[in-house]
Regions:
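A conserved C-terminal secondary-structure "cap"
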Residues: 2-53, 59, 208, 213-313
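N-terminal low-complexity or amphipathic/hydrophobic leaders
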Residues: 21-115
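Flexible, glycine/proline-enriched loop segments at strand-loop-helix junctions
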Residues: 49-52, 118-127, 179-188
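Solvent-exposed alpha-helices and their adjacent loops that cap or buttress functional pockets
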Residues: 71-74, 82-85, 99-102, 137-140, ...
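Short HxH-centered metal-ligating active-site micro-motif
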Residues: 111-156, 191-203, 212
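Short, conserved beta-strand edge motifs with alternating hydrophobic and charged residues
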Residues: 148-150, 181-182, 207-210, 218
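Class I SAM-dependent methyltransferase SAM-binding "motif I" and its flanking Rossmann-like core
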Residues: 152-189, 193
Length: 313
């Protein structure tokens, strides 16, 4: 049986006003409208050129987030953004530039024919990026962003030839909402292969590309990025859980269908994906002590020691 709503009184207790978000993250439209707490929403723009500038900044941040997570593998991997000015075009990373170094000015604009028509100094295009992402964007007008890379746990799980089990609350985001693309024909350099991937994806949010890696899509950059990060972690969790269960001669405990469907409505909506990515982008956009140069850390440490000695005893 699906769990009761977190906003309903339990055991005869009176309903009290929630001062914190009552759902986790509780962002599907129907539930969101019922809440006293107003969740933020993605910004909207009247000027598509201003929207383009903003989204390019977010896309560059997305690459740096991927870099921090170690999702880069040599020159493999790409995230694309449908251009708000000309929606048949998309922005993508230049081939060979490290994820962690990408700025908005480095991004390149690719048209429907696969020609680079604008961008930074490096205008090399990864052919596989065009073949996969052009096909996905063309087949799915609702997709603003698509992300693919050869992350370690994702590509490991993709070698098993199976879909993800629903064994955690987080994996409920992908319950009946991801596919297994059961084919590997080498690097995607042919238009037909890109179309096959897009066809297999259908209306789902994610695909496990067998012997290859993960692909996620979203109505916002943030959504696509969060689904990728979350799917990678779900693959990691299942690899560990399956190994631990097998070592004990047992199996993992699966979440029931009704509970999984209920939870997917809460944690698997586009708005849930967008909002869940907020901490990732907030951290990327602000300096923190973990990113300070070593000499700054040393100066900070010496200052702290001096303050402690001067204020103790």
């Amino acid at each position: 049986m699906a769990p009761p709503s977190a906003t309903e009184p339990q055991n005869g207790t009176e309903r009290k006003l929630n001062t914190t978000a009552p759902l986790e993250p509780g962002l599907d439209d129907k539930m969101g409208n019922m809440q006293k707490f107003k969740f933020p929403r993605p910004p909207t723009f009247d000027d598509p050129y201003k929207e383009r500038a903003y989204l390019k900044g977010r896309l560059a941040a997305a690459f740096r987030i991927f870099g921090k997570y170690g999702f880069d593998e040599g020159v493999a991997g790409h995230i694309t953004l449908r251009d708000p000015v000309e929606p048949t075009n998309f922005w993508v990373n230049p081939f060979g530039v490290a994820f962690s170094l990408i700025k908005a000015s480095d991004l390149i604009l690719v048209d429907a024919k696969g020609e680079v028509i604008d961008g930074g100094e490096v205008r090399l295009l990864n052919t596989a990026a065009y073949m996969i992402h052009h096909a996905v964007h063309e087949a799915r007008p609702d997709v603003i962003c698509a992300a693919h890379s050869h992350s370690i746990y994702g590509r490991t799980f993709c070698a098993l030839g199976r879909k993800l089990d629903t064994i955690t609350q987080d994996s409920c985001s992908f319950h009946n909402d991801h596919v297994l693309y059961e084919s590997f024909n080498g690097v995607v350099l042919a238009e037909e292969e890109g179309k096959n991937i897009a066809s297999a994806l259908g209306q789902k949010k994610a695909a496990l590309l067998q012997n290859h890696g993960l692909l996620t899509v979203g109505k916002t950059i943030e959504e696509a990025v969060f689904w990728f990060v979350s799917l990678e972690k779900c693959c990691h969790a299942q690899l560990m859980a399956d190994a631990a269960a097998a070592g004990r001669g047992g199996e993992t405990v699966k979440i029931g269908e009704e509970e999984a469907v209920y939870t997917h409505k809460t944690v698997g909506s586009p708005m849930a994906g967008w909002f869940s990515a907020k901490p990732l982008f907030d951290v990327e956009g602000r300096p923190c002590i973990a990113s300070f140069p070593e000499n700054h850390l040393l100066a900070f440490s010496m200052h702290s020691i001096g303050w402690f000695l001067g204020n103790s005893g």
